[in-house]
C-alpha cells in the first residue's frame, strides 16, 4: 500500500511540476513575441544548420547577448529597455536566416557570431485547420526567427566538447556514405541512420510517404531495437555482463544525440535506457511504466512536446503494440490453421517473421490511424504489405551500414567493395517503396474527422480490448458487434444534426499567399473560386500544401462548382492538385483571351476527371439553390493588352440582399470598359463585398469603379512581405475614402464572413 502511495505522490508532484513549467513557458513565449520587429546587434552561438535553399541558409542559434551600442549620454530608461530585451532573448533558441549573397561561408556548431538582426515572431494558423508554425517551433523550444545581416565570426569551436565530437562523427558518416554510395542511395542511407533527410530525392521521399514507410526515415523505436540487438552481440564479448550493459547505455545516449534528440528519438531512447537499467538492477522492465516515465520527462522539459506529431505517432504506435500485438498474433495463427512455431528452421523462421511483422504493423496502426487522419488526411490499406517487405531488409541494412562506417575508420578504402552490397540493399529498398506506392489504396484521402468520430473510434477500440481480455478468457464477439453498432447508430443520429443543411451563407477568403482563393458554402453546395498558386513556378504546390488540406479540414470531399476567373498561375495553379484528387462536378470558365498552357492543362484535367465545363460570358446567369451567379464581363469585345488579366471573368454572387463582386486581376482598362458597358445601369455593379482586383495593384481599383460598386467590405488576397508592393497605398486610400472596411490576408490570414442575421467577420490571426 505504501508503495502505491509513494508512486501516486511522485506522479502528482511531477504533474504539478509539468503544469508549473507550462505556465512559465507560456508567459516566456508571450514575452518574447511582444518584441516582434525588435532590431539590434546580437551575439549568438550556432547550434546547427536547419535548412538550405538556393538563396539562404537557416541556422538554429542560442542567443547570448544584445550588443546594441549605447552612448554614455543615453537616457537610463533606454538602458533599462535594452537590459530587459537582453534578458528576455538571452539563452533562448532561435532560427537565423542568412542570405547567401550576404554571407557565403557555412557556420559550424560552436561558432560565436555577431550579427544585425530583426526578430520576427512565428505565425500561428493562417487558415482554418492549417499549419501552426508557431506551435511547431514551440515543440522544438524555438522562439522565432531573426533575419541576419552583417554576420561576423568572433570565435570558433566553442560549445560542448562531446557535442562537437558527435557532430564531427555525424559529418564523417555523411562523408563516408557519400564517397562510397550512389547519390540517391547515399542520401537515403543518411536518412535511415541519422534521420537527416535534407538532400533526399523528393520522388523517393514521396514514395516512402505514399507507401506508409516514412517512419523508417525518422529514427524511431525500431532503430533502437536494431542498435540494442547489435550491442547485445558485441557486449557478449565482455566477461562482465554489467559492464556490457553500461556500454550499451552509453551507446544509446550517443545514438540519441547523433540523431538530433527529436521527440520520437527521446521517447525511444528513454524507454530503451529504462529497460537496460531495469536489467542492471535485476528488475523486470514494464512497458507502461517506462512509457509513463518517458512522457513525464519530456513534458517536464518541454510541455509543448505533446503537440509534436512525431511524438504522438511514436507513443500511439507503442501503445497499439503493447495492447494488441499478442492478440493479433494469436488470432493470425488460429485463422491460418497453424500452431505457434517452436522448431528452428528457415521455413519456420520465415512464417514466424511474417506473423510477427503483420501483427506489429496492424497493432501499431490501430491506434495511430486517427492521428494520421487528423494530421495528414490519409489512410493506407496497403501498409501491411509495404512494411512486411521493407521491414525484412531494414534491420540488416541499418546494422550493416553502421558496421561499415565503423570499419572505415580503420580500414578506409580497403572496405569499399563491401559498400556495393549496401548500395544494392538500398536500391532494393527504394524499389520496394516505389512498387508499394503504386499499390491500390496505398494512399486514400479522407476529410478531417470530427472529434466525435475520433472519440467513438477509441471507445470501440477500448471495448474491443476489454472484451478480448475479459477474465473468463472468452471473446464475446456478439457483445463487441452490438456495442459497435450502437456507437455507429448514435453517430449517425448525431451527425445529421451537426451537418444539417446550411441555411446561411458563409464566405471563406482563404490565405494562399500571393494569390486568390475563395470558398463559398450555401444551400449545401460548395463553390470554390480560384485556387491560388505560384507566380514564378516555385516547387511549393499551393494546391497540395494549402488548398486541398484546407478543403478536407472543412469537411469537404466534393466541390459542386469551381470557378476560374482567369488562367494566371496565381489564380489557377492550386486547382490542379484539387481536381486530380477530389470530385469536381462543374467548372465555370471563360475561353475569351485565356489561351495559355495553364488553360490547356486545366481543360485536359477537367475532361479526364469528367468535370462538366461551363463556358460563360457577359449576361449569363447560373442558379444555385436560392442564390445565383451573374456574369458581368467579358463580352464580345476583348482587351488585347495584358489579355489574361483584363479579360478575367467579373461576376456577382448574390444571396438574398448580400452580394459579392469578384474581379479577378482586371486593371484600369477593363474597369473602364465595364463602366462603359453599364453606364446606363450602374446599380448592376453595386455589391456589399468587393474582392479587390489584382491583389490591390496600383493599376486597378480606380476611384470611378469604386464609386460605382460602392462596397461596404473589401477583401484583398496578398502575400505577406511580397515583392510586388501589394496592396498599393493609393488603392488603400481610395478604399478608405468611401468608408470601406478593408481586410487583407497578409494581416488577417483567412477571412470568414458569415451571413446570418447580418454580417459577422472573423480574422484567423485574431482568433488565437
Predicted features and spans:
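Hydrophobic alpha-helical transmembrane segments in multi-pass membrane proteins
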Residues: 8, 202-383, 400, 446-500, ...
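Non-globular, low-confidence helical/coil segments that flank catalytic cores
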Residues: 57, 73-81, 102-118, 136, ...
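Juxtamembrane interface at the ends
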Residues: 28-29, 369-373, 406
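N-terminal alpha-helical targeting/anchoring segments
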Residues: 3-11
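Transmembrane alpha-helices and immediately adjacent membrane-cytoplasm interface residues
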Residues: 12-31, 491-497
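Aromatic-rich juxtamembrane segments at the membrane interface
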Residues: 139-271, 276, 366, 508, ...
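Membrane-interface helix/helix-cap signal primarily in integral membrane proteins
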Residues: 19-215, 545-552, 558, 592-594, ...
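Hydrophobic alpha-helical segments of integral membrane proteins
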Residues: 162-181, 188, 196, 204, ...
